[in-house]
Amino acid sequence: FHFDCFWMKEFHWSDFVWDERVFPDPEGMLKRIKAKGLNICVWINSYIGQESVLFAEGVEKGYFVKRTNGDVWQWDMWQPGMALVDFTNPDACKWFQSKLEVLLDMGVDCFKTDFGERIPTEDIMYFDGSDPKKMHNYYTYLYNKCVYELLERKRGKGEAVLFARSATAGGQKFPVHWGGDCWSDYELSLIHISEPTR
């Protein structure tokens, strides 16, 4: 059973906190769903909005991608002032995993790792000094790897699964992937079927 983005409050993506207005008892709800034999997936992404309780913590600890002047890189695409977790920083990855681990302990089984493909390439720097242009594709690998390693640690080898929207070479190590957000017509369906084999 999949919960898409609005399991969290609007403008709080991603804080990994259930919206109590809609889900006043998330643990009880998850237990009821699991009692019916269903596994649970929740939507996440690697952007942390200014309204998220995690934003200040991530800024203070240096867990976000930065501009070359040292400021946190921010973007206003879906919500104001989103920062991007820097998965080249091992501590940032552990921090991100620690937030997801709370959800796994609550009863969530997997994560839909959305986005990861709209990565800046100009005027930014990564913790490990990676080339921003090369990171444009590699970022999604690191994002999915970070989440998958947590799932494997918590659920066991052969039991971990994520639901990834974007991937690059090597992404097949972190199953499964979906080719979503496309039109449902014959021509695009053919492209959609052939693209993964390239």
Which residues does each predicted region cover?
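Catalytic-domain carbohydrate-binding cleft regions of carbohydrate-active enzymes
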Residues: 1-194, 198
